[in-house]
């Protein structure tokens, strides 16, 4: 009998630089595909791929890079974002060659789409546009407030004293990664996602990104000592902005270290991070496949 459903297990924010693979709870083995939404292992792209393969246990794993997958290991480490992506792809190719089949796929802005049977997977890191900086700011209705908050947030985030470590730990060919680089890359990746979603596909579509497509997922941190501009760092409002007919069936993301599972129109949006203590190893999402003629 033909397969009628596909079962996807989402996972993200594994941080193998902090924990051993054996410390991760055993995954429900009923899944068909492991969807890895980034931050597998800081600065060690080969280990990131190898760990995903180990967790999947011979089943397909589909991966996007998280911000911390692209961190260098100190000022003497000159690897750039492009180099990290190349190393991730190379290790995936080695693993596939060893298995004599495609057991792991890395999706990125340069290669964002793959298909497994009837299911289309689209994946990018989805850096944020920094437009959500005013989310927690009172009187945020005025457009001027949005722009001013975003500009101030980018300035604070880009400063070595007050900003996230990624702006010291990630490198480009031009130098250190900056909030403006993130804004530019968000625009590029947003266009790539939209173009892919606009293409015809007969069957379910799953999007995998590291950063969140819904800004409200950052609200779990409100009042917990994080900067006022934190929503801008964690996500954008890309999913609500999409027309209903372009929305995927499932959107898997990470970056926020809290479980998240909501419905946005036809899309179920899920984060299932290992970091944060809320990981559910039995969270398997079942999508119906189109019935084929008998």
Regions found by a protein language model. Name each.
Residues 10-12, 34-39, 62-67, 105-109, ...:
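Active-site neighborhood of phospho(di)ester-bond hydrolases with catalytic His/Asp-centered motifs
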Residues 2-4, 115, 219-250, 256-294:
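Binuclear metal-dependent phosphoesterase catalytic core
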Residues 6, 32, 59-60, 117, ...:
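Short coil/turn segments at beta-strand junctions that form active-site/ligand-binding loops
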Residues 15-22, 41-46, 68-75, 110-115, ...:
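Active-site environment of divalent metal-dependent phosphoester hydrolases
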Residues 1-64, 68-77:
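N-terminal active-site segment of His-dependent metallophosphoesterases
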Residues 91-105, 192-204, 240-250:
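A structural motif corresponding to the C-terminal end of an alpha-helix
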Residues 60-138:
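A basic- and aromatic-enriched beta-loop-alpha substructure that forms the phosphate/nucleotide-
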Residues 122-206, 211-229:
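Active-site-proximal loop/helix segment associated with metal-binding centers of metalloenzymes
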